[in-house]
Amino acid sequence: MAEAFALAEDAAAAGEIPIGAVVADRDGRIIGRGRNRREEGDPLAHAEMLAIAEAARAIGDWRLEGTTMVVTLEPCAMCAGALVNARVEKLIFGAYDPKAGFCGTLGNLVQDPRLNHRMEVVGGFEEERSRELLQRFFRQLRKRSDGAERWQSG
């Protein structure tokens, strides 16, 4: 989770919502990393999507069987669908997302028995730290009066 938080901090520094994600293989080696990059003009550039794509390139296969996704915020429906399609084995996320979370909050796509793949889910891991990171980002965003992009770490 430390690497996911570091990526989330990087996202915030770039003016993105602070979400970071990593994909680790069976041995715990990180094979994919991602941070939000939507403000670069790509609505699909969620941290999870980028980490999945990098992991698939790293192993040369779209099937990420035996891997674990660690992300600072509960994935949305799009990212949850990508996790299912990539056959990720386990999902660990920080804060629950009451507005878009689709791994237990608004729905549970990653454990839907109608789908061809389901995964183990651990939600609320380091939840307070995840929530505080997001709250700090949005507080600073609201405080900006001159339009300058600013992020103050930790």
Which positions does each model-derived feature cover?
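Short beta-strand scaffold segments in enzyme catalytic cores
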Residues: 19-28
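Short, basic and Ser/Thr-rich N-terminal targeting/leader segments
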Residues: 15-19, 65
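A short, polar/charged loop-to-alpha-helix boundary motif
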Residues: 40-50
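Immediate flanking context of iron-sulfur cluster ligation sites
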Residues: 61-74
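Zinc-dependent deaminase
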Residues: 1-11, 78, 82-154
